[in-house]
Every structure is written in structure tokens, then in C-alpha cells.
Amino acid sequence: MAKKENRIVITLACTECGDRNYTTTKNRKNDTNRLELMKYCPRLRKRTLHRETK
């Protein structure tokens, strides 16, 4: 039996417009909370808060 992977692929969605602009990986063991990063939103043309989505 293979062990369950710790690193998973997640998508980051803009909190202002709702677009899913970025994908990244996170370690399931070290980062149990939802990831929040300030990233550039091409639709709004400014830096906004992006949150992890399911």
C-alpha cells in the first residue's frame, strides 16, 4: 500500500472578483489552515487577497 501524499495541489481564488487565477501546492501536515496570499488579479489589475478553494 502506498502512503498518502503530503503535498496537494490547490487553487487560489480572488476574494474580490472570484476568479481562480493561480494553482500552487501546499503541505497538508504543516499547513492545516486555508492558505491566503496577496497576489495580482489580472481582471482587476491590482494586488488582492487570494484564498485557497476546494
UniProtKB/Swiss-Prot annotation:
Gene3D superfamilies, alphabetized: Ribosomal protein L33 (2.20.28.120)
A UniProt-annotated Pfam family: Ribosomal_L33
PROSITE patterns, alphabetized: RIBOSOMAL_L33
Presence of the UniProt keyword Ribonucleoprotein in the record: yes
GO cellular component entries: cytoplasm; ribonucleoprotein complex; ribosome
A GO term, aspect molecular function: structural constituent of ribosome
Keyword Ribonucleoprotein: yes
InterPro entries assigned to the protein according to its UniProt record, in alphabetical order: Ribosomal_bL33, Ribosomal_bL33_CS, Ribosomal_bL33_sf, Ribosomal_zn-bd
Keywords assigned: Ribonucleoprotein, Ribosomal protein
GO BP term, pick one: translation
Cysteines paired by S-S bonds: none
Annotated family: Belongs to the bacterial ribosomal protein bL33 family.
NCBIfam families: PRK00504.1, PRK00595.1, rpmG_bact
Protein name as annotated: Large ribosomal subunit protein bL33
UniProt source species: Herpetosiphon aurantiacus (strain ATCC 23779 / DSM 785 / 114-95)
